[in-house]
Amino acid sequence: MRKIFIILICLLIASPAFAGKAKKSPLYKLQKQLGNGEMISIPSYSTTSFIGIHKGWYKESPITVEALLTLPPGDGPFPVLMITHSSGGPLEFAADWLEFMRDQQKPLLDMGIGTFYLDNFSARGVKDTYRDQSTVTLFSAYIDSFMALEFLANHPKVNKKKIGITGYSRGGNNSLMIQEKKIRDALVDKSLYFAAAQPRSPECYAAAMFENPTPIPETKVWLVHGGADDYTLPGPCVEYGKKVKANGGDIKIDVREGWYHTFTGNYAVEKSPALIFHRCPPVYSKDNGQWDDEAVNYIVKHGPFESREDFELAQKEDPRAAWKGMFKAMKKAKCIDKGVHEGGDHGKEFMPEYLKFWKDNLL
């Protein structure tokens, strides 16, 4: 792996205030590499977890994120694919070790599909989160995706019924959770939806997904996971997919035997000293945004919090302390392990079926 990731649980309750001064987006470099595209500013918000969306706390933390939009020649309206990054940040769009991110653009444009590279980090003063996942939360990225969807839906050259989204790892979570009504309905008009999503290798065990998912039926999801992935385990995603399907969602879970995390990276499988929490309790969100009892009771038992109420108050008023307390609890309970595998150089092998998915669902 070209980076060291820290598993997603650390970012679930992070404070939007942790972000520093906005950085110049690597999308400007990507724009030069690709030789096309228009830089776009998207008004958005930051939050801690779903409870911040559910209770409207996110409105107190506005922010403007950037994206790179490229449309095929002509008047349109065109379908558009939103491409999101992992914990490595938007620099990976231009990285030598992840050519897949750029190689998809030309064939997509040739098919008549526009591209929209979304930067969740730079506006929040963050380069990447693999060194400290507490700096940008997953749920902030979900907000960005829906704000970007709203922008694209109002663009005169975009077909608002043919917008897709994709990404891997953290970007895989971003691409999976846009199928959730509870998030969509709290943020944008209920008539808006992504036509299709292609998440890869999301974290489904400790990412505060919903105990009771309420999927948007119009969104078709094709989730691809490596069967050998020891970083973000495929099993919890298979089980989550069953819940989504049982509740009316259009989802296919595709587990590839022998594939590891970051399987589209153009490098051989290698060991990474990443922290993993597979022996800690899973974390799920209830409909009201609260975490499940098992996870919270575990944190209260081993951490500095006296009760659920104490923990949730910290999430709102001092998220940094909440995160530190949670991590301290996991460390004290000795449920944290270290060491995963990444890579595999399957990008070129995967590309034809990946492009076919977009041809079938956005054209």
Model-derived segments and spans:
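N-terminal cap/lid segment of alpha/beta-hydrolase-fold proteins
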Residues: 21-76
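Short substrate-entry loop that stabilizes the transition state in hydrolases
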Residues: 75-78, 83-127, 206-207, 230-234
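Alpha/beta-hydrolase active-site loop
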Residues: 133-156, 177
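Short glycine-enriched nucleophile-adjacent loop
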Residues: 153, 172-187
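The feature captures the conserved acid-bearing segment of alpha/beta-hydrolase catalytic domains
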Residues: 189-258
